[in-house]
Every structure is written in structure tokens, then in C-alpha cells.
């Protein structure tokens, strides 16, 4: 494949955009290449500026569960656009999507729409602090919750990719209120709670960690957190920006049967448009302005285009058998890639929850950030570039999740497994 046009555009972009991209992991820096510039997408495919075609397992980092340019979503957004793109005023669309979210998520009795996942987690933490009157928060190494100052401490996703989990520009006075435990370790949580008794406002985590690869919760981990939070008066927040409506219609909380006090959402609920949301128990959410004293606002919150795309997307997710079909395809692909690695004699540890999956370049179990960080990132980079040449587009980082969509066909899956089989032999 040739990437001449992408190289040219990247050179132009670097002169006027920091790093040449508007989100760091897109730069392909960790895989030692220049990024692809994408021209368009349709179904399971994306097409770059050099007219190369790729089977896409990034899916805009999760939102495109129906595939790209899903006709009903596109048509609904076009129709909505004819009435105006933004009003800065309430619309019926906000009520419709809010009710759909409430009906789906066990933890949500009231919900506030925002414009990004970062806004959602930032606002949820502020609300938890306001509700409890406590300052400290507890998060987990390798879990990424957006780029708010309080959460860029031992973070995953792009921060992990570039080896800087603590960002310059975050004052020590902010960071000192953020406690960090080890994912899947109740013992580390209990120690921090004991050391900071009565000071922790909330525990926030990805119930399925998706920003250090895909790391499922071990049996009893989520249940243990729920019990600890109840006993200590701590707000339990599930960051389901990635897992919400992805691993199940009711998110990870529905899949695992553990109900948090608050939930943050994004990605899928906007159908590919910028969106976020946070919700939870009525008694907590009513502390939010204008009904309460905890302030939060946004010019484009509840944007009608995003609400429309979200409504249309969720309608299709409700169809009988949707998640069963997605599960079957995801299982086939994940197992096929694992088998291809084994047949090539290549060490690999595969994980999957629903349509989220990851191939870790290590022979050892991955269950937290320490074990994820031990992966062979150089081998992953070789694999990534080889797969790209075979027309398979993966996230350009070992520490990201791959996503299946409803648009991926049996032919796509078979072609991807065949490409993986070839690439594992090449990089061995």
C-alpha cells in the first residue's frame, strides 16, 4: 500500500496542529509510523486519503457499534439538521434519549447530558464531592477517565501509550486528592480506605477496563467494591463511557449484576457525534444545578444532532438478538486470532468481554496495569504495521481495545483471521 497523501497531510498538520493530531494516540507514535488520514467510512470499512480500504476495528474508538454511516442514523440526523443544529435551549429529543438511558441502566434514575466523556466523569466527581462533602477520590492504575486534572494520575489510554501516566500541568495540590489502587485488587482498595477513613468521596473505575487493553473484572471484584462503598458511605461510580451499551444494552452493570451509585456514559449514546452523560440515584442528581448547588453547564449539552443520532442508535440496539449476534461474531474473531497466534508459535494472551477484545503480546495473564505494561510493545508495533498492510485497521497502541460492529461480515472476520495468521508468522 502507498500512503503518500497521508504523509503529505501529516506534514501539513504538524505545522499548525500540536503533534499533527487532535488526540495524541492518533499520531501512530507508539508504532513508529505516520498516521493515516481518513477520507470516508461505510459499514465495516474505512478509506484513507490514498484510497486504501481497511476493515475497521477501531470504530471511532467505540461509538460505531452499528458500523459507519448507518443509513437510519444518517437520515435522521439530516432531517434534524433541517430544523437547526443547536438552540441552547431544551428540546424534546433530550427527554427521549434521557428516558431511554434511564430505562436501560439499572443505576440511573436521573441523567444529565454533556458533550464528552471527559465532561461526564469530571462532573460526576464534582457532584460526588458536593454530595458527600469529601475531597478525595479513588481510581485505579491504568483506568482512563478523560483528561480532567484530577483523573490524569496513573491513567491508561493515550497517557499509557506515551509512558506519561502523570501529565505535566496537573498541580500537586490537585493530584494529592487522587488515590490510586490496583485494578482487580480489593486489598489495595481496603488499605487506602483505612488510611483515608472518612475522606473519600467516590471510587471511580471502568467496570471493564478498556484503556489498558481489555481487562475484565475478576469474580468478586465489583461486588467487593459495592460492599465497601456501601459500608463506608463512598459513592461508587462506574465509568461506562466505553462499556455502556457495548458489552450489554444495560452496560457492564447489567452484565455483572452490580449497581453503582452513579454512571458515566458517552460514545455509543451519541451514535458517532460528540456526547457524554452522567446519571445516578435521584437523591444525588438533585444536588446538581439548577435544582441543587453543585454547578455544571455546557453550551452544546443535549445538542439535537447528537440526541437524534443516539436515539436512532439505541432503537436498533433494542432489536431482539442484536447482542447475541454481536457476541457470536466477536467470539469467532477473538478465538480465530488466538488460534492463529498459537499455530505460529507466538505467545499471546487474549481477552474479551462482549464486543470489546484485545490481544496482549505476552504469554502471561493480564489482570491489571502492571501485567498489561509488561507486554512486548515492540512486537505489537510490528504486528500492527503488518496488519495495516493487509488491510486491517487496529488501534495504534497495545493499550487500547478493539471493537466489533454489527456491520462486520463473515467475510470480514475470515479475512482478518487470515491476515493475522500471515502476520504472526512474519513477526515471529
Curated annotation (Swiss-Prot):
Similarity comment: Belongs to the class-III pyridoxal-phosphate-dependent aminotransferase family. HemL subfamily.
Assigned EC number: 5.4.3.8
Membrane-spanning residues: none
Cross-referenced InterPro entries: 4pyrrol_synth_GluAld_NH2Trfase, Aminotrans_3, Aminotrans_3_PPA_site, PyrdxlP-dep_Trfase, PyrdxlP-dep_Trfase_major, PyrdxlP-dep_Trfase_small
Listed pathway(s): Porphyrin-containing compound metabolism; protoporphyrin-IX biosynthesis; 5-aminolevulinate from L-glutamyl-tRNA(Glu): step 2/2
GO cellular component labels: cytoplasm
Residues recorded with modification N6-(pyridoxal phosphate)lysine: 267
UniProt KW Cytoplasm keyword: yes
Reactions it catalyzes: (S)-4-amino-5-oxopentanoate = 5-aminolevulinate
Stated name of the protein: Glutamate-1-semialdehyde 2,1-aminomutase
Enzyme class (EC, first level): isomerase
A matching Pfam family: Aminotran_3
Organism: Trichlorobacter lovleyi (strain ATCC BAA-1151 / DSM 17278 / SZ) (Geobacter lovleyi)
Tree of life domain: Bacteria
Record keywords, A-Z: Cytoplasm, Isomerase, Porphyrin biosynthesis, Pyridoxal phosphate
Main location: cytoplasm
Coiled-coil stretches noted in the UniProt entry, renumbered to this chain: none
Molecular function via GO: glutamate-1-semialdehyde 2,1-aminomutase activity; pyridoxal phosphate binding; transaminase activity
Subcellular location: Cytoplasm
GO BP, sorted A to Z: protoporphyrinogen IX biosynthetic process
Subunit text: Homodimer.
Cofactor dependence: pyridoxal 5'-phosphate
Amino acid at each position: 500500500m502507498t500512503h503518500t497523501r497521508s504523509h503529505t497531510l501529516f506534514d501539513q498538520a504538524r505545522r499548525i496542529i500540536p503533534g499533527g493530531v487532535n488526540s495524541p494516540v492518533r499520531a501512530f507514535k507508539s508504532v513508529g509510523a505516520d498516521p493515516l488520514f481518513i477520507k470516508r467510512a461505510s459499514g465495516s470499512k474505512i478509506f484513507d486519503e490514498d484510497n486504501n480500504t481497511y476493515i475497521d476495528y477501531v470504530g471511532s474508538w467505540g461509538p460505531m457499534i452499528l458500523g459507519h454511516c448507518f443509513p437510519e442514523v444518517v437520515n435522521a440526523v439530516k432531517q434534524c439538521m433541517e430544523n437547526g443544529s443547536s438552540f441552547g435551549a431544551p428540546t424534546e429529543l433530550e427527554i427521549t434519549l434521557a428516558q431511554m438511558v434511564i430505562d436501560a441502566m439499572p443505576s440511573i434514575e436521573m441523567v444529565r447530558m454533556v458533550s464528552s466523556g471527559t465532561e461526564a466523569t469530571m462532573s460526576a466527581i464534582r457532584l460526588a464531592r458536593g454530595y458527600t462533602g469529601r475531597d478525595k477520590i479513588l481510581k485505579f492504575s491504568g483506568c482512563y477517565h478523560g483528561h480532567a486534572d484530577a483523573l490524569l494520575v496513573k491513567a491508561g489510554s493515550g497517557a499509557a501509550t506515551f509512558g506519561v501516566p502523570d501529565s505535566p500541568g496537573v498541580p500537586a495540590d490537585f493530584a494529592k486528592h487522587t488515590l490510586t489502587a490496583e485494578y482487580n485488587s480489593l486489598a489495595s482498595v481496603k488499605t487506602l480506605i483505612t488510611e483515608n477513613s472518612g475522606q473519600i468521596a467516590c471510587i471511580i473505575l471502568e467496570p471493564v477496563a478498556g484503556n489498558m487493553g481489555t481487562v475484565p473484572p475478576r469474580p468478586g471484584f465489583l461486588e467487593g467494591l459495592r460492599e465497601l462503598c456501601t459500608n463506608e458511605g463512598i459513592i461508587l461510580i462506574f465509568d461506562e463511557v466505553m462499556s455502556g451499551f457495548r458489552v450489554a444494552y444495560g452496560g457492564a452493570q447489567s452484565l455483572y449484576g452490580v449497581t453503582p451509585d452513579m454512571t458515566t456514559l458517552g460514545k455509543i449514546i451519541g451514535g458517532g457525534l460528540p456526547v457524554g452523560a452522567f446519571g445516578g440515584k435521584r437523591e444525588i442528581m438533585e444536588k446538581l444545578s439548577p435544582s441543587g448547588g453543585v454547578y455544571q453547564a455546557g453550551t452544546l449539552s443535549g445538542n439535537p444532532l447528537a440526541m437524534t443520532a443516539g436515539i436512532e442508535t439505541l432503537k436498533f440496539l433494542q432489536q431482539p438478538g442484536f447482542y447475541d449476534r454481536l457476541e457470536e461474531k466477536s467470539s469467532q474473531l477473538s478465538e480465530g486470532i488466538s488460534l492463529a497466534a498459537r499455530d505460529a508459535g507466538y505467545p499471546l494472551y487474549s481477552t474479551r468481554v462482549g464486543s470489546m477484545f484485545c490481544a496482549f503480546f505476552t504469554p502471561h495473564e493480564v489482570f491489571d496495569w502492571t501485567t498489561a505494561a509488561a507486554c512486548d510493545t515492540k512486537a505489537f508495533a510490528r504486528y500492527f504495521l503488518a496488519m495495516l498492510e493487509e488491510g486491517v485497521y487496529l488501534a495504534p497502541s497495545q493499550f487500547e481495545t478493539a471493537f466489533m460492529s454489527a456491520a462486520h461480515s463473515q467475510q470480514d472476520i475470515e479475512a482478518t483471521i487470515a491476515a493475522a495468521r500471515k502476520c504472526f508468522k512474519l513477526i515471529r
